[in-house]
Amino acid sequence: MTDLRHYDVIVSPVITEKSTMVSEHNQVVFNVARKATKPEIKAAVEALFGVKVTAVNTAVRKGKVKRFCGLVGRQSDVKKAIVTLAEGQSIDVSTGL
């Protein structure tokens, strides 16, 4: 895997109230590519941030149905990864890469 592939796997960090509360338990939340697997996510986080990952949990958030000027549309589904880091490791997602 090249660095370009790692950047393709991790789309963006998720910065919400719930994800900030989870960060107290050595966990970080990322939006990832829909086709990304748990081993690919683990390898990308370890390569890009230089940390040890102990677990990766994923969830797919289904897109909402939205209306605009009477037309019905649908937002895209988003895959979210909750990455658990080893004890004593941390990632500051607010500064970026």
Swiss-Prot record:
Gene3D superfamilies under this entry? 3.30.70.330
Q: Which lineage do the record's taxonomy fields give for this organism?
A: Bacteria, Pseudomonadati, Pseudomonadota, Alphaproteobacteria, Hyphomicrobiales
Q: Which InterPro entries match?
A: Nucleotide-bd_a/b_plait_sf, Ribosomal_uL23-like, Ribosomal_uL23/eL15/eS24_sf
- Under what name is this protein listed? Large ribosomal subunit protein uL23
* Quaternary structure and partners: Part of the 50S ribosomal subunit. Contacts protein L29, and trigger factor when it is bound to the ribosome.
Q: What does this protein do?
A: One of the early assembly proteins it binds 23S rRNA. One of the proteins that surrounds the polypeptide exit tunnel on the outside of the ribosome. Forms the main docking site for trigger factor binding to the ribosome.
- Superkingdom field: Bacteria
- Family the UniProt entry places it in: Belongs to the universal ribosomal protein uL23 family.
- Coiled-coil ranges (or none): none
Q: Which GO terms describe its biological process?
A: translation
Q: Which GO terms describe its molecular function?
A: rRNA binding; structural constituent of ribosome
According to its UniProt entry, this protein's organism is Brucella suis (strain ATCC 23445 / NCTC 10510)
The terms describing its cellular component in GO are: ribonucleoprotein complex; ribosome
Keyword terms, alphabetized: Ribonucleoprotein, Ribosomal protein, RNA-binding, rRNA-binding
